[in-house]
Amino acid sequence: MLIKILGSAAGGGFPQWNCNCENCLGLKQGTIQAKARTQSSIAISDNGKDWILCNASPDIAQQIAHNPELQAPSSIRRGTSIGSIILTDSQIDHTTGLLNLREGCPHQVWATPEVHEDLSTGFPIFNMLKHWNGGLVHHPIDIQTSFQVAVCEAIRFTPVPILSNAPPYSPYRHRPLPGHNIALWIEDTRTGHSLFYAPGLGQMDDSILSYMQRADCLLVDGTLWKDQELALLGVGKNTGQDMGHLALQEERGLIHLLSQFPKQRKVLIHINNTNPILNEDSVERATLKQLEIEVSYDGMLIEV
């Protein structure tokens, strides 16, 4: 099973267009060692030819341009190697890219009923794209049931409800239902190898820990180093908890959590532009390296 990191940053990308925090300014001026990153999205394949897109970031057109395996085969005039799309939530940063994919409609989109409701009301992408050659075809995800997608039939997806938050535009903000945010336990049925994918983790519970324990690779939320990082840097008021993200450094943060999984490969994704781990020469980055926690980057290929 192949996992291609299309975008490794959180909302806004890195550098963020309107930000002069130490990281963003340092990257723009060339004073820090860091890689530019687009917004969070991955693609999964069981054969290297057909792909399932997990979340459609606002940067999806750029991501497809930089990853030829997702482009139309040269034998056809128009098309794509993306056969289906799975959404883990209804956040703007994970769904706006659907608008950029409208020329390729109809698209088969797997999402929970809660996500579909948000994307039919508060941010009505499903309605907006109806007139584009059939638009988005919704395949409901039942959070109690594993599912497979025909385009990569060897891969089985198990939705794992996670404690995070609904988007700011949603009427369920600060009171999300179980289907508003899911992680995915992704298994190659041919080999039994598996990936736990959770770009947004707000809190932990026994179910999440159980799936993480069973996985060979953990591709998880690396949004913030400190819970109050935005306020400390003077770029915002929201904490990690406000946004549904468990910070890395906190006493019961993600680093502490990942220490419980010595056998698994551990990779961070959805990294905010303020996070010091983006600076490859930082103390924080060195800490992760010592703990054998990787920082994903755009174009990274993971084989499980």
From Swiss-Prot:
Pathway: Cofactor biosynthesis; pyrroloquinoline quinone biosynthesis. Coiled coil: none annotated. GO terms for biological process: pyrroloquinoline quinone biosynthetic process. InterPro entries: Metallo-B-lactamas (IPR001279), PQQ_synth_PqqB (IPR011842), RibonucZ/Hydroxyglut_hydro (IPR036866). Transmembrane segments: none annotated. The keyword Hydrolase does not apply. Keywords: PQQ biosynthesis, Transport. Pfam families: Lactamase_B_2. Belongs to the PqqB family. May be involved in the transport of PQQ or its precursor to the periplasm, in association with PQQ biosynthesis, but is not absolutely required for this synthesis. PANTHER family: COENZYME PQQ SYNTHESIS PROTEIN B, HYDROLASE C777.06C-RELATED-RELATED. This is Coenzyme PQQ synthesis protein B.
